[in-house]
UniProtKB/Swiss-Prot annotation:
Organism: Haemophilus influenzae (strain 86-028NP)
Main location class: membrane
Gene this protein is translated from: rbsA
Cited SMART domains: AAA
Protein name from the UniProt record: Ribose import ATP-binding protein RbsA
S-S bridge residues: none
Assembly with partners or alone: The complex is composed of an ATP-binding protein (RbsA), two transmembrane proteins (RbsC) and a solute-binding protein (RbsB).
GO molecular function: ABC-type D-ribose transporter activity; ATP binding; ATP hydrolysis activity
Amino acid sequence: METLLKISGVDKSFPGVKALNNACLSVYAGRVMALMGENGAGKSTLMKVLTGIYSKDAGTIEYLNRSVNFNGPKASQEAGISIIHQELNLVGNLTIAENIFLGREFKTSWGAINWQKMHQEADKLLARLGVTHSSKQLCAELSIGEQQMVEIAKALSFESKVIIMDEPTDALTDTETEALFNVIRELKAENRGIVYISHRLKEIFQICDDVTVLRDGQFIGERIVAEITEDDLIEMMVGRRLDEQYPHLSQEKGECVLDVKNVSGSGIDDVSFKLHAGEIVGVSGLMGAGRTELGKLLYGALPKTAGKVRLKNQEIENLSPQDGLDNGIVYISEDRKGDGLVLGMSVKENMSLTSLDHFSQKGSIRHQAEKMTVDDFILMFNIKTPNRDQQVGLLSGGNQQKVAIARGLMTRPNVLILDEPTRGVDVGAKKEIYQLINEFKKEGLSILMISSDMPEVLGMSDRVLVMREGKISAEFSRKDATQEKLLAAAIGK
C-alpha cells in the first residue's frame, strides 16, 4: 500500500490553547482516509498546518517520500495537494468557469483569455459531478449546495494526487452526494488519495476505506473502516459510548404561540400550521422545497404577500428581521457565515449584537452585565474558546454554531427557528446541541426545526411538516412519522 502523505507527531499551540498534540495522519494511494473528531478536535488546524497556513511547532510532514514544509496553500496546491473547504469561498459576481480557473485562465496564442476553452473545460468538470448548470452562470445565482459542487469542481481541476474534502456534502442533495461519491470512486481508481473530513457516520461507512480519529488535538488511532462499528468510532471520538443519539424529551405541549394561516411569499404557497409552547415542530423536505424561505419569511427576512401570522393571539407583520426580533421570533440561519456571524468580531460582540438593549441603561451599555451574561452562555453552551474576546472566525464550526444559537437565545424569544441546527457539527457536539434544544423546550420555548437530516427530524420532533414546491405536502405526529413517509411526501408519491 503506497503512502502518498504521512504526517507524524505534529504539535501546534495558540495563546491559551494547545490545538494539536502529537497529531498524525497517513494518506494512501487509491484509498479514502476519513479524518474524524469532535469540533475543536484539531482537524481543521491539522489541514492548515499541512497546507502552510499555520507553521507547526513540532513534527514531520512527508509527501511522496520527501520531507516538506509548504509556505502557503498555493505551494501545497502546486505540489499536488488540493483542499475543498467546508465554508464556501467563491466570488459571487463571477461565473462558474471564472471561479474554477481564477488566476489560471486559459490563454490564446496572443495572450488573451480563451473563453471558449475555459467554458469547455469547466462544463466537463460540472458534467463529471452531474451539475446541469452552464459554466457561464454567475455563482451568486446558485444555491449553497450548487456552490459547493463548484468548489469541488475547482479542486478537481488541479488533478491533484491528494484531495482533502472538508465536510463536502453538508449542503448537497442526495443526488449531488451520490454524484460526488461516484467522482471519489473514479479518483480512487486513478490511484489518488482522498482525505474525507465529515461528521456523518453513514458517509464514512459508505465511501471511506480507513479512518483516523483526533480528540483534543491528539491522535487516537487509525482503523480500517470495514473492521469497526459506528459505536467503536463514536467511542474513539468522544471517549464514551453514545447509546442515544437523539435525546427526545416527552412533555405536554402548552398554548398555541404561533398560528400561521394561508401564508404565501417568496417561494412559499398557502402554508398553514400551528406551533405550541414547549413543542418542537420539524420541517422536512428536499432542497428547494421552501423550508428556508418559510423560516426567513416568518422572521421578516423575506416578504409575505398573503395570509396571516398570529403570535400569542395577536396578529403581527414582520417587515424586517428587526420586526421579527421585536416580536420575539428568532431565526438561526443555515449559512452561519453568510447570514449569521460577523467573523471578524469577538465571541462577546457576536453573542450580544442583537440584544444590546437588554444591557442598556440611560443610553449607555452596562458592559459588566454584558460580559457576565456572555460568560454564562459560554459555560452553558460549552463553547470551546480561550475567552469571550476570541475572534469568532477562529472557532471551529460547531462552536460557531453554538455562538449563533446563544445570540438568538439572548434576545429571550417566544419562537426559535433553527435552520439546519447541526450542519457542520460533529456527533459529540450534536448531542450537546440537542440537549440544549431540549432545555429550551422544557422552559416553554416554541421551536421550529428546519433540517435536511431526516433522522434528526424524526429523533427530535414532536410533529413533522413536510414541504414540497413551497407547500406543506404532509404533516405527521411523532409516532406516525417514518423516513419512508417523509421521503414519499417530499417527492410527491
